[in-house]
A protein has these predicted regions:
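Nucleotide-activated sugar donor-binding and catalytic core shared by glycosyltransferases
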Residues: 1-184
């Protein structure tokens, strides 16, 4: 497990707001008690958790730290909410934002309002989910296509007479492509 500095503070805030809450670490040792909220205080489980939620808030995006990757909850076809600090995934964010597949909030109050609205208006949430799934479908295989294109470009570059003395990079790209495809 990782050391999450604010875990107990967040647990306290949730309880103060009237929610029953537990942590992922506690659930490893105790049976769940139908808690309203489970706080993740472990590493490597966020992707699995996205699959069971209805609405996903992408953390890190309410502060100038930069948000997490939208593609993780999108892979599960979720309604996504982000803060305004998505500069580290600006192209991906723009794609989802321009197609109304994610909502952007400025602060915690707006976040609460939008989460509530998505549950009060399930048809809006379902439209967002459909658009998210469409974006994922349309972009499936993009990494492989990019690697193939890069391989072709490098091959053409290295085949030109003025560049024949350079070390061939295309074998490295082929190796990378094989490795990367194994990951996705």
């Amino acid at each position: 497990t990782r050391r999450v500095l604010r875990t107990m503070e967040v647990v306290h805030l949730c309880r103060k707001a009237g929610f029953s809450v537990t942590t992922r670490t506690k659930l490893q040792n105790e049976a769940p008690q139908d808690e309203d909220i489970v706080i993740l205080d472990t590493i490597g489980e966020l992707g699995k958790i996205y699959s069971i939620g209805d609405v996903v808030f992408v953390g890190g995006s309410l502060v100038p730290h930069g948000g997490h990757n939208i593609l993780e909850p999108a892979a599960h076809g979720k309604a996504i909410i982000v803060g305004s600090h998505m500069f580290n995934f600006k192209d991906t964010y723009a794609l989802f934002k321009n197609r109304d597949a994610c909502l952007t909030v400025k602060n915690g109050a707006e976040l609460a309002t939008e989460v509530t609205r998505l549950f009060d208006e399930p048809e809006h949430r379902h439209r967002m989910e459909e658009e998210t799934r469409a974006i994922v479908r349309e972009n499936k295989g993009a990494s492989r296509k990019s690697a193939v294109l890069l391989h072709q470009m490098l091959d053409a570059y290295e085949s030109s007479p003025e560049n024949r003395h350079h070390v061939r990079s295309t074998q490295k790209i082929t190796n990378f492509q094989t490795y990367f495809i194994d990951l996705v």
